[in-house]
Amino acid sequence: MKMLILIGPEGREADLRELVARHSVHAYSEFRNVTGEGETGRHLGTSVFPGRSVVIFTVVPAGRLADLKAALAEFRKGLYAEEGVRAFVLPVEEML
């Protein structure tokens, strides 16, 4: 099992949910109003550094990961340069 963490711009959460749903992933958690700084700049939800992010994470069988990564790469092609979407994959040792 692998944990897939997606971080993207606020306003794209429905697109990210749809992306994982198309790959039969129906269990996820979502954090909204996330602030931070990365390659696309600061997103602090202020007038000086506008914008916020959304974080969606899910646990998937390792066998589904390649298809999800390919779909994410295709999704990223349609984004504006300032709309960075990142994905992180972590091993899941155990689910309780």
Model-derived features: where do they sit?
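Positively charged, small/polar-rich N-terminal and surface patches that mediate targeting and assembly
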Residues: 1-96
